[in-house]
């Protein structure tokens, strides 16, 4: 085998493997790094001869589409909802998290006031000469507590494009994975390729804690999916004119691109930050106050109660630096909000109270089959308790309800005599199929008998 490898050579220039830095194998052929560089030079020369061919084609199609679409006007001070109005809208969709909703309401209101502000730094008075800087938002809280939902609800109320990105898929430019500019492409697509509209949108970057570097100290090796991504995001978060490939993928110096100014885009970053409590605990020299219960560690009830409220006061930027975020990144996220873990009572409210609550969703689904669905209070409580045990927050609720409703939703559409159905605690506890039978005409609800 070693003798065979010694005779490997480039299929294009004929140089042996030991004469080049890299030899890449294909189906029966090999190409060296020098030939790859030569191919790139040839392609670059051809693009230089006609660099605007593809660019102009895309620009013309984009302008043609924009001409047929009514552009949304930029926000005015009068049209921006006040913080109290924003929080009221959030209350209709998100249960609990009062401090976080208040922080978000003020931050979003100030951000869109900034967009409506005419001051450009050239005015004659102190106020008109003031340039307002952008304040991005960092959300910290356990999984399933409503971080993404809060961002989605804000975008819905403000009627602006909204895009979600997963930080774990991002890598530093030049490495396998997504470039940070692809985040802007998603926002642009949500805005139907309207650049002006996209520049007023909201981007939510989830799992931001997963790009923390492994230690507080800078690494001597390249961390392309951790610190490298943080560095790549800095200019975008602060505000820059980014060149976005309209078809996604990697940027090319002579390829087609769309310019987007990120200075008016609101970035909201969220993450669970598992283990951040240990960092705070170490600094304070007190018992742990973290999000995740540890069976090997004794925690008092007062410790657990402090998680939501007191961590807001206890957490400092230096804790995030020790966790693995670089200081420059933290500096570009000046507004932070801590979201509390959801207890069983909050999960009960999530099932029934919000506008798009799960119970309302399933009632709507069955109403299409002319069946009125209801849930006993103890059934709702049992569902919430089971979701709380699974430790995945509100995300567990849908899975549990789907399990309970599977056989019901399978059989009810074919049974035209059934007009009402009630979900009981027994059904939740058993979470089994069972036979659906109609009640007599003088009974109001349908009961479920175990098979």
UniProtKB/Swiss-Prot annotation:
Single GO MF annotation: ATP hydrolysis activity
Keywords, ordered alphabetically: ATP-binding, Chaperone, Metal-binding, Nucleotide-binding, Zinc
Pfam families (UniProt xref): AAA_2, ClpB_D2-small, zf-C4_ClpX
GO cellular component: HslUV protease complex
Taxonomic path: Bacteria, Bacillati, Cyanobacteriota, Cyanophyceae, Synechococcales
InterPro entries hit by this protein: AAA+_ATPase, ATP-dep_Clp_protease_ClpX, ATPase_AAA_core, Clp_ATPase_C, Clp_protease_ATP-bd_su_ClpX, ClpX_bact, P-loop_NTPase, Znf_CppX_C4
Binding site for ATP: 142-149
Family stated for the protein in its record: Belongs to the ClpX chaperone family.
Region Disordered, annotated ranges: 50-73
SUPFAM superfamilies linked to this entry: Glucocorticoid receptor-like (DNA-binding domain), P-loop containing nucleoside triphosphate hydrolases
Keyword hit for Metal-binding: yes
Domain ClpX-type ZB as annotated: residue spans: 1-51
Annotated residues for binding of Zn(2+): 10, 13, 32, 35
Organism: Prochlorococcus marinus (strain NATL2A)
NCBIfam families cross-referenced by the UniProt entry: clpX, PRK05342.1
Subunit structure: Component of the ClpX-ClpP complex. Forms a hexameric ring that, in the presence of ATP, binds to fourteen ClpP subunits assembled into a disk-like structure with a central cavity, resembling the structure of eukaryotic proteasomes.
Protein name according to UniProt: ATP-dependent Clp protease ATP-binding subunit ClpX
Reported function: ATP-dependent specificity component of the Clp protease. It directs the protease to specific substrates. Can perform chaperone functions in the absence of ClpP.
UniProt cross-references to SMART domains, sorted A to Z: AAA, ClpB_D2-small, zf-C4_ClpX
């Amino acid at each position: 085998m070693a003798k065979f490898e010694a005779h490997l050579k480039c299929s294009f220039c004929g140089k042996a493997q030991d004469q080049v830095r890299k030899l890449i194998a294909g189906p029966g052929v090999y190409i060296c790094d020098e030939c790859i560089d030569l191919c790139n030079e040839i392609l670059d020369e051809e693009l230089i001869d006609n660099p605007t061919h593809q660019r102009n084609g895309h620009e013309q199609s984009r302008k043609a589409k924009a001409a047929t679409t009514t552009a949304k006007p930029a926000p005015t001070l009068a049209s921006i909802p006040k913080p109290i109005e924003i929080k009221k809208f959030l209350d209709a969709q998100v249960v609990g998290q009062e401090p976080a909703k208040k922080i978000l309401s003020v931050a979003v209101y100030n951000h869109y006031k900034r967009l409506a502000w005419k001051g450009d730094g050239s005015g004659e008075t102190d106020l008109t000469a003031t340039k307002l800087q952008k304040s991005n938002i960092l959300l910290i809280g356990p999984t399933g507590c409503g971080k993404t939902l809060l961002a989605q609800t804000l975008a819905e109320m403000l009627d602006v494009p909204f895009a979600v990105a997963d930080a774990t898929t991002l890598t530093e430019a030049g490495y396998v994975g997504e470039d940070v500019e692809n985040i802007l492409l998603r926002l642009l697509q949500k805005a139907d390729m309207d650049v002006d509209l996209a520049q007023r949108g909201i981007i939510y970057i989830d799992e931001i804690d997963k790009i923390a570097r492994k230690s507080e100290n800078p690494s001597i090796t390249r961390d392309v999916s951790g610190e490298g991504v943080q560095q790549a995001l800095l200019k975008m978060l602060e505000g820059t004119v980014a060149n976005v490939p309209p078809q996604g993928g990697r940027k090319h110096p002579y390829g087609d691109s769309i310019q987007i100014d990120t200075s008016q885009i609101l970035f909201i970053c969220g993450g669970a930050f598992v283990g951040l409590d240990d960092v705070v605990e170490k600094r304070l020299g007190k018992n742990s106050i973290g999000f995740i219960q540890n069976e090997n560690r004794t925690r008092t009830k007062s410790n657990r109660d402090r998680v939501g409220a007191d961590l807001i006061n206890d957490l400092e930027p230096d804790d995030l630096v020790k966790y693995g975020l670089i200081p420059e990144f933290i500096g570009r996220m000046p507004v932070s909000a801590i979201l509390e873990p959801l207890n069983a009572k909050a999960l009960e409210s999530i099932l029934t109270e919000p506008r798009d609550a799960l119970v309302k969703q399933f009632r709507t689904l069955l109403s299409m089959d002319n069946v009125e669905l209801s849930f006993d209070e103890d059934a709702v409580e049992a569902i919430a308790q089971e979701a709380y045990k699974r430790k995945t927050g509100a995300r567990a609720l849908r899975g549990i309800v789907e399990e309970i409703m599977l056989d019901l939703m399978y059989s009810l559409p074919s049974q035209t005599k059934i007009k009402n159905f009630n979900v009981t605690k027994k059904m939740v506890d058993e979470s089994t199929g069972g036979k659906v039978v109609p009640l007599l005409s003088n009974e109001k609800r349908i009961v479920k008998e175990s098979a």
